[in-house]
Design a protein with these regions (language model features):
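Ser/Thr-rich, low-complexity intrinsically disordered terminal regions
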Residues: 1-185
Length: 185
C-alpha cells in the first residue's frame, strides 16, 4: 500500500514534502487559485449594487474569485458619483499528514489537513455622470491593490476556521477523499 500510494501521489499535482516510512507518515501540500470551493466551503455572498441605470446583483461563493461593484462612501464630485469594481483573488493552501500503517484488519489510513485560505483584492474606479447618463472607467487611476491586510483563515480537517472577518470556512473533504481514493486496500 505504501509504495503504491507514494507512486500515485507523485502523479498528482500535490507536492510530496516529506516521506518517513519508519514513522509511517507522508506529508503533502498544494496551492490553488481556481475552483477553491471544491475543497473548502466559505459560504455564499450576495452583493447588490444600484446606481441610476446600472442594477447589479452579484451572488458568489466566498471561497472563489469574484467581482462586484460598490459606491464610494465619500463623494467629492457631486452631482457625479464615484464607484468601484472590486476584484477578489483568493488562494488556498493545504498541507496534510497521511498516516499509513498495518493493522489486524488490513491497513489503517488517516489524512489530516491544515488549510489556509486568504485573498487579496484590487479595484477599478468608475465615474457616473448623471447629466450624460454615462458610466466611465477612470483608467488614469489604473487597477489599484487594496492595501489593508486580510487575515488568513486557517483550520484543520473537521474544524471550522474564521478570522476577524465574518468569513467561516470548512473543508468539503475533497482533498482527503482524493488521497484515500488513491489507496487500494
Amino acid at each position: 500500500v505504501w509504495d503504491d500510494l507514494v507512486a500515485d501521489l507523485s502523479k498528482t499535482f500535490y507536492v510530496i514534502n516529506n516521506i518517513d516510512k519508519q514513522s509511517r507518515l507522508l506529508n503533502v501540500s498544494f496551492r490553488i487559485t481556481d475552483s477553491i470551493s471544491d475543497y473548502v466551503d466559505c459560504g455564499i455572498s450576495d452583493k447588490k449594487f444600484s446606481l441610476a441605470s446600472k442594477q447589479l446583483d452579484s451572488i458568489y461563493k466566498v471561497a472563489d474569485a469574484s467581482s462586484y461593484f460598490y459606491s464610494a462612501e465619500v463623494q467629492t464630485n457631486i452631482p457625479n458619483t464615484i464607484y468601484f469594481e472590486f476584484f477578489r483573488q483568493p488562494s488556498l493552501e493545504g498541507r496534510a499528514n497521511i498516516y499509513v500503517a498495518p493493522s489486524e484488519q488490513g491497513t489503517k489510513v488517516s489524512v489530516n489537513t491544515r488549510y489556509t485560505w486568504i485573498f487579496r483584492a484590487e479595484y477599478d474606479t468608475y465615474l457616473y455622470m448623471p447629466l450624460y447618463d454615462s458610466h466611465t472607467k477612470q483608467s488614469s487611476y489604473g487597477r489599484r491593490q487594496v492595501t489593508s491586510y486580510v487575515e488568513p483563515i486557517s483550520f484543520n480537517t473537521n474544524q471550522r476556521g474564521g478570522g476577524l472577518s465574518d468569513v467561516l470556512c470548512v473543508s468539503t473533504g475533497k482533498f482527503e477523499n482524493e488521497i484515500l481514493n488513491l489507496i487500494e486496500i
